[in-house]
């Protein structure tokens, strides 16, 4: 079996980062599996109560998050597909270049990547994204979403935590090491 080795340069690759690609793949698998269950067991736009604040409601989202641009006439399909593809490629390169001791940032990138690819699969194969999780409180309804959207949201929160709280610590440690 060939041994995986780190490569230098633009395409440098660290084998320890395969675990983060595994997290992305896990997010995609769970997302696609739950969307398949929703699509095969739910009737379109017919809410199934789960908890007093949660319904399973199968919906088709032709736009972006929260149905943004869903009624824009079709061009948004190409825009969102292209953006998701480009961002995914960038995130794969970024993810594979993470240092061994990094945890929060690669987890964030892996979740965002998995969520983006999960929704991209829908958009490319179905022409829309399957949403089915519907949260509400009394008459206040949050737009339906899916596991991919949840992975993107959790990844974004982790990215913000890393950026605003952990980056300063990394800079301080680097300055101490340098002195």
Curated annotation (Swiss-Prot):
Q: Which reaction does it catalyse?
A: Release of signal peptides from bacterial membrane prolipoproteins. Hydrolyzes -Xaa-Yaa-Zaa-|-(S,diacylglyceryl)Cys-, in which Xaa is hydrophobic (preferably Leu), and Yaa (Ala or Ser) and Zaa (Gly or Ala) have small, neutral side chains
Q: Where in the cell is it found?
A: Cell inner membrane
Per the record, the domain of life is Bacteria
- Tagged with keyword Ribosomal protein: no
Q: Name one GO molecular function term.
A: aspartic-type endopeptidase activity
Q: Does the keyword field hold Cell membrane?
A: yes
The record's similarity note reads: Belongs to the peptidase A8 family.
The record's listing under HAMAP family reads:
LspA
- Entry protein name: Lipoprotein signal peptidase
Q: Which organism is it from?
A: Acinetobacter baylyi (strain ATCC 33305 / BD413 / ADP1)
């Amino acid at each position: 079996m060939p041994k995986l080795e780190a490569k230098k340069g633009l395409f440098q690759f660290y084998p320890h980062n395969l675990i983060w690609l595994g997290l992305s793949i896990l997010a995609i698998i769970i997302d696609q599996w739950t969307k398949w269950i929703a699509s095969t067991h739910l009737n379109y736009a017919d809410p199934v109560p789960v908890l007093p604040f949660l319904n399973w409601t199968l919906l088709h989202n032709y736009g972006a998050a929260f149905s943004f641009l869903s009624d824009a006439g079709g061009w948004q399909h190409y825009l969102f597909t292209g953006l998701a593809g480009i961002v995914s490629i960038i995130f794969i390169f970024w993810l594979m270049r993470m240092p061994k001791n990094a945890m929060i940032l690669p987890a964030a990138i892996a979740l965002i990547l998995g969520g983006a690819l999960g929704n991209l699969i829908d958009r490319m194969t179905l022409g829309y994204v399957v949403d089915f999780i519907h949260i509400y409180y009394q008459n206040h309804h949050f737009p339906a979403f899916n596991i991919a959207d949840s992975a993107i949201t959790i990844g974004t929160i982790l990215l913000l935590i890393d950026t605003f709280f952990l980056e300063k610590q990394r800079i301080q440690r680097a300055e101490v090491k340098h002195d």
